[in-house]
UniProtKB/Swiss-Prot annotation:
It comes from Bos taurus (Bovine). It is a single-pass membrane protein. It is an enzyme of class 2 (transferase). The coiled-coil domain is required for the induction of autophagy during endoplasmic reticulum (ER) stress. The keyword Isomerase does not apply. This is E3 ubiquitin-protein ligase TRIM13. It holds the Pfam family zf-B_box. GO terms for biological process: ERAD pathway; innate immune response; positive regulation of canonical NF-kappaB signal transduction; positive regulation of macroautophagy; protein ubiquitination. A zinc finger (B box-type) spans 89-131. A zinc finger (RING-type) spans 10-58. Pathway: Protein modification; protein ubiquitination. Endoplasmic reticulum (ER) membrane anchored E3 ligase involved in the retrotranslocation and turnover of membrane and secretory proteins from the ER through a set of processes named ER-associated degradation (ERAD). This process acts on misfolded proteins as well as in the regulated degradation of correctly folded proteins. Enhances ionizing radiation-induced p53/TP53 stability and apoptosis via ubiquitinating MDM2 and AKT1 and decreasing AKT1 kinase activity through MDM2 and AKT1 proteasomal degradation. Regulates ER stress-induced autophagy, and may act as a tumor suppressor. Its main location: endoplasmic reticulum. It comes from the Eukaryota.
Length: 407
């Protein structure tokens, strides 16, 4: 199109030809352009007229006016068609045949095709029509198709759209609610973990304080002993070169007393017993703890005694339970014990009298009396030991409570 436009352009105004006129030399120009040139020649030649020369080849012509020049109807028609093509939309091309315009309509397949598709392609035996006829036919078909489509299931589609949007909104609300539950669950879980962490770390701080209370006094004792030793060495350094007997003897007496005090001061042990928690602590023991059992996390306890397995915060409750249990268990025992003791003492007197009677009555029961006496003595000793054991247990529990200040 650009090359064609060059051939349809006037050399003077550089625009498409407007009412083109052809000169005897066969060059074409717009009528208005030639009129302008002729008017210029008339103004420049006041005394005599100069011949008209072609603007392209400069060949003179005897034309006296533009109207006398021949109209180039062929060129004028080409320019008019070119303007129509230029204004009209660009014609689509065939995808299967490069550059071929889609200028034929296939009625069989109801689609645009090119000339090659119609003569040598898959549409060779189909029915064709012109673009104008196809346009008129499809325009009528469009009206009926559009009307039927406009009412096709529109209400059903709108109803389903409303249902889907409602379901979507409810689903999102449920998901949001579940999401909030999950968030709340993990917040509680995090709170539980933080609580357990703070609890265990607090136990560690308590143990650190206990360690410092155990070691600091011994360390201070050793520092005091070392300081006394340095003072003794300073005294020795001060008077070892003294030549006055009195002064030397006084200093020697002071030095000997200082050495005596230092030697008599016992050194604290260097290996204090460590806490069982420090020996047995290992976080790998927590690896099997499930999230649902996270509240069961605790520091490892001493496995040597039952008391050490009880968490420190439960000691008061444990002691109360022990005291109540002992009181409930041993109250009837103690009651029976003292009443049994009185009965046994009575039985012993009666058996002694009875054995004396049997001894006087017959000698063959002498051995039986001996065994009865042994039995009564054994029961008496058992009751005494049971009473002593009960008192020892109660005293130990009371001392334990007072010592650790659990109540």
């Amino acid at each position: 199109m650009e090359l064609l436009e060059e051939d349809l352009t006037c050399p003077i105004c550089c625009s498409l030809f407007d009412d083109p006129r052809v000169l005897p030399c066969s060059h074409n120009f717009c009528k208005k352009c030639l009129e302008g040139i002729l008017e210029g020649n008339v103004r420049n030649s006041l005394w005599r007229s100069s011949p008209f020369k072609c603007p392209t080849c400069r060949k003179e012509t005897s034309a006296t006016g533009v109207n006398s020049l021949q109209v180039n109807y062929s060129l004028k028609g080409i320019v008019e068609k070119y303007n129509k093509i230029k204004v009209s939309p660009k014609m689509p091309v065939c995808k299967g045949h490069l550059g071929q315009p889609l200028n034929i309509f296939c009625l069989t397949d109801m689609q645009l095709i090119c000339g090659i598709c119609a003569t040598r392609g898959e549409h060779t035996k189909h029915v064709f029509c012109s673009i104008e006829d196809a346009y008129a036919q499809e325009r009528d078909a469009f009206e009926s198709l559009f009307q039927s489509f406009e009412t096709w299931r529109r209400g059903d589609a709108l109803s389903r759209l409303d249902t889907l949007e409602t379901s979507k909104r409810k689903s999102l609300q449920l998901l949001t609610k579940d999401s909030d539950k999950v968030k709340e669950f993990f917040e509680k879980l995090q709170y539980t973990l933080d609580q357990k962490k703070n609890e265990i770390l607090s136990d560690f701080e308590t143990m650190k304080l206990a360690v410092m209370q155990a070691y600091d006094p011994e360390i201070n004792k050793l520092n005091t002993i070392l300081q006394e030793q340095r003072m003794a060495f300073n005294i020795a350094e001060a008077f070892k070169d003294v030549s006055e007997p009195i002064i030397f003897l006084q200093q020697m007496q002071e030095f000997r007393e200082k050495i005596k005090v230092i030697k008599e001061t016992p050194l604290p042990p260097s290996n204090l017993p460590s806490s069982p928690l420090m020996k047995n602590f290992d976080t790998s023991q927590w690896e099997d703890i499930k999230l649902v059992d996270v509240d069961k996390l605790s520091l490892p306890q001493d496995t040597g005694t039952f008391i050490s397995k009880i968490p420190w915060r439960l000691y008061p409750l444990f002691v109360v339970v022990i005291l109540l249990g002992l009181l409930i268990f041993f109250s009837p025992t103690m009651f029976l014990e003292w009443s049994l003791f009185d009965e046994i003492a009575t039985w012993k007197d009666n058996l002694s009298n009875f054995s004396s009677y049997l001894t006087r009555s017959a000698d063959f029961v002498e051995q039986s009396v001996f065994y009865w006496e042994q039995l009564t003595d054994g029961l008496f000793i058992f009751s005494e030991r049971l009473k002593s054991f009960t008192l020892v247990v109660l005293n130990n529990v009371a001392e334990f409570v007072c010592k650790y200040k659990l109540l």
